[in-house]
Structure formats: structure tokens, C-alpha cells
């Protein structure tokens, strides 16, 4: 079968830059790599074909020969080979292409012993507080289960007086090699999980793990103004890492209980206060509670309508990030009386007889609009 044009194989033009060649090859190599397509002969052939094309076009001298003479430049017996292709990939460097995908790649020397330090797991703790506690902020002791570094072996997993041995599978490199077509791929050692070490004399307290289960108690600070659903990160308070790895983090998820009187929206609080028809009509002064445990007075002017809001500046929740407080909004709800006695009914009947349109402007406007609607 005739070989395909190398530029067609990579899907690039003859004027493609080295970066464009590398990018095109990487996409094909990742797509058709045998590790991603085990047992797929067609993918393996395309993988090899792409590698052959890139091996030529990425080399300046070979590319020039190919541009001048095509595939004939690399056929045996000719004097035009300029070092030859020889069926392999010559001096092309593929390691940088696969570094982020496969780790150390190719048949080169190992970059030295690599120890895998495993970071500890993050933990979650759900903490419930009242709205008053969210207003004031608080310190609280919490207790939770976690893992801590074993003090007996100082976290290395070996008995006191012993040290981990070099892994017998990877020789301490943390990686093993396997052949994939034209390539030799270095992968994480399955025996030592990349640490390069084996525990041959395990610590009896932690069974060679380096960590132990523990119950931990710490004091946490809940800042003023914390809202429901706030997540607080406590760095390094999670589970212990292994093989010298860093601890994970502890995340506090704050649940602020709903309040019987106050409703919250961001840093503002809302409060509903019922008043009688007489107080709404004649005006009055009301006294309301505030979230800090104090009291505040509000003057209700005569003629106050149902649902009217009054703003008390700075009487809301503290800003969690910054200074100052939100506001408290008090909404007055006019309550219509029920179960009236004879005297109350008589007074209201008298009031109905003497009330006029001026006293009820909204009613007057409504009937004016209604009459206009009915006429039309």
C-alpha cells in the first residue's frame, strides 16, 4: 500500500510552523494511542503513521529532503537520505509532547527518584447556629473523626529503627516502563504507587500506613455576619497526608436556623409588626425588638397604609467582609378586627356614615377608573 502524504497524515499545510506540526501530531497521538484503544489495530496503525510523519517533518533536514523528493528520500539505496529515516523516528523529540499526558515519556533516562507525597483528604463539618449567634459571632469547640500521623513511626510506616526499602519492582524510580509500538512509556509503578519505596518492616501501631484513626477536638471561630450556607476553610485541619504529604483541609458548612421574628436577605433584616386600624388611622408609636437584644421605637404617622415599611439604618446584620451593618426594615400590617361587640359595631357604623372620599383617596380613584371602564 502506497504511503500517504505526511502533510495529509497530520492534516497540515506545507507551510505549517513547528508549533503547528507538534500540535497536530499531539492530537492524533493522544486520539490513537494504544493505551486508549487497546486491541484496535486500525488505531495502532494510525498512531504509528502519525509518529512517522512527525518524525520526518519535525526534523529540518529530513523535512527538506521530503519536500524535494517525497517518500523516495528515505528509501534504501539512494544518496539522498541525509542521515536516513530507517523506519524509526530518528532524532525527533516526542517526550515534551506527552509529558502532561503520560508523565515521563520515551526511552530516555529517568529524571531521578520520584517520591509521591499524597495529600490528605479534605473533611466536611456541618455546624448549626442561631441568627443571634451569626450576629454576634462565636467561638466553638468541635469534635470529629480524622486520621493523624502515626507518632510511633513518624509517619513513614516502618518500625522504629527501620526505614522503607527501595521498591524491588521499579528500583526506587517510582515508574516502570512498558512498550507501546515504537515507544517506551514510563508509568507509575503499581507496586509502590510511585513512592519508590516498600515497607518491609511495617509499624505495628499503624500497620505500615503511616497514619492512624483519631478523634480530634479543635476550637473554631465563626465570624460575625456569617450567612446560611457559608463555607469556611480551615487549612491543614483535614486528614493527615501520607509519605510526608500535606494535610487536607477542613471545611465548615454553616447552617443558620430560621428565626421566629426576623427574616434575612444578605445583611438586611425584615420584621413584620401588626397594628390595629385605629393605630394605622390615628398614628401611634410602636416598640420593636432588635437582633442585638435591644429595643427600638418607631413613630407610625396617621394614615399609615397596610404594608408600609420603615427603615432602621444599621440595625441589620454585620458585614462579614468589611465594617458596618445592614438595615432593619419594619413592615406594618394593619389587622382588621374580628368578633366585634355591639358598642364597637355601633361606632364603626357611625364612622361609615360620616367618612368621605377625602379620607379614602384610593377608593375614590378606583371607582373613577371603574366608571370609565364601564362606560367604554
Curated annotation (Swiss-Prot):
Residues reported to bind Zn(2+) 2: 167, 170, 189, 192
Compartment list: Cytoplasm
GO molecular function: ATP binding; heat shock protein binding; unfolded protein binding; zinc ion binding
Annotated S-S bridges: none
SMART domains to which the protein is assigned, alphabetical: DnaJ
Residues the entry annotates as binding Zn(2+) 1: 150, 153, 203, 206
GO biological process: chaperone cofactor-dependent protein refolding; DNA replication; protein refolding; response to heat
Keywords: Chaperone, Cytoplasm, DNA replication, Metal-binding, Repeat, Stress response, Zinc, Zinc-finger
Cofactor: Zn(2+)
InterPro entries listed in its UniProt record: DnaJ, DnaJ_C, DnaJ_domain, HSP40/DnaJ_pept-bd, HSP_DnaJ_Cys-rich_dom, HSP_DnaJ_Cys-rich_dom_sf, J_dom_sf
CXXCXGXG motif repeat copies, ranges: 150-157, 167-174, 189-196, 203-210
Primary location recorded for the protein, binned into one broad class: cytoplasm
Secretion signal, residue range per the UniProt entry: none
Subunit (UniProt): Homodimer.
Domain notes: The J domain is necessary and sufficient to stimulate DnaK ATPase activity. Zinc center 1 plays an important role in the autonomous, DnaK-independent chaperone activity of DnaJ. Zinc center 2 is essential for interaction with DnaK and for DnaJ activity.
Protein's job: Participates actively in the response to hyperosmotic and heat shock by preventing the aggregation of stress-denatured proteins and by disaggregating proteins, also in an autonomous, DnaK-independent fashion. Unfolded proteins bind initially to DnaJ; upon interaction with the DnaJ-bound protein, DnaK hydrolyzes its bound ATP, resulting in the formation of a stable complex. GrpE releases ADP from DnaK; ATP binding to DnaK triggers the release of the substrate protein, thus completing the reaction cycle.
Protein name, as recorded: Chaperone protein DnaJ
Organism: Pelagibacter ubique (strain HTCC1062)
Gene: dnaJ
Amino acid at each position: 500500500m502506497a504511503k500517504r502524504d505526511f502533510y495529509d497524515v497530520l492534516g497540515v499545510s506545507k507551510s505549517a510552523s513547528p508549533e503547528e506540526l507538534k500540535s497536530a501530531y499531539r492530537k492524533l497521538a493522544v486520539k490513537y494511542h494504544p493505551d486508549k484503544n487497546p486491541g484496535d489495530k486500525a488505531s495502532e496503525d494510525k498512531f504509528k503513521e502519525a509518529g512517522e510523519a512527525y518524525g520526518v517533518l519535525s526534523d529540518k533536514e529530513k523535512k527538506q529532503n521530503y519536500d524535494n523528493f517525497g517518500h523516495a528520500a528515505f528509501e534504501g539505496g539512494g544518496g539522498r537520505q541525509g542521515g536516513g529515516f530507517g523506519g524509526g523516528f530518528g532524532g525527533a523529540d516526542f517526550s515534551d509532547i506527552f509529558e502532561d499526558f503520560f508523565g515521563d515519556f520515551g526511552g530516555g533516562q529517568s529524571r531521578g527518584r520520584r517520591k509521591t507525597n499524597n495529600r490528605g483528604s479534605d473533611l466536611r463539618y456541618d455546624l448549626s447556629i442561631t441568627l443571634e449567634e451569626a450576629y454576634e459571632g462565636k467561638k466553638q469547640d468541635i469534635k470529629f473523626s480524622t486520621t493523624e500521623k502515626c507518632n510511633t513511626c513518624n509517619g513513614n510506616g516502618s518500625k522504629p529503627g527501620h526505614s522503607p526499602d527501595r521498591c524491588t519492582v521499579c528500583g526506587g524510580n517510582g515508574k516502570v516502563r512498558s512498550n507501546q509500538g515504537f515507544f517506551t512509556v514510563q508509568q507509575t509503578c503499581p507496586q509502590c504507587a510511585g513512592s519508590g519505596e516498600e515497607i518491609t518492616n511495617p509499624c505495628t501501631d499503624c500497620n505500615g500506613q503511616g497514619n492512624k484513626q483519631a478523634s480530634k477536638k479543635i476550637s473554631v471561630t465563626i465570624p460575625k455576619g456569617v450567612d446560611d450556607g457559608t463555607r469556611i476553610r480551615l487549612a491543614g485541619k483535614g486528614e493527615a497526608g501520607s509519605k510526608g504529604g500535606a494535610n487536607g483541609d477542613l471545611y465548615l458548612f454553616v447552617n443558620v436556623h430560621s428565626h421566629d421574628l426576623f427574616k434575612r436577605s444578605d445583611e438586611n433584616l425584615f420584621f413584620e409588626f401588626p397594628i390595629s386600624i385605629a393605630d394605622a388611622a390615628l398614628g401611634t408609636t410602636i416598640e420593636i425588638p432588635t437582633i442585638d437584644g435591644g429595643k427600638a421605637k418607631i413613630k407610625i404617622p396617621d394614615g399609615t397604609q397596610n404594608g408600609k415599611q420603615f427603615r432602621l439604618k444599621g440595625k441589620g446584620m454585620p458585614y462579614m467582609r468589611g465594617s458596618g451593618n445592614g438595615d432593619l426594615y419594619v413592615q406594618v400590617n394593619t389587622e382588621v378586627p374580628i368578633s366585634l361587640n355591639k358598642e364597637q359595631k355601633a361606632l364603626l357604623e357611625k364612622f361609615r356614615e360620616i367618612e368621605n372620599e377625602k379620607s379614602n383617596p384610593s377608593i375614590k380613584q378606583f371607582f373613577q377608573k371603574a366608571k370609565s371602564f364601564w362606560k367604554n
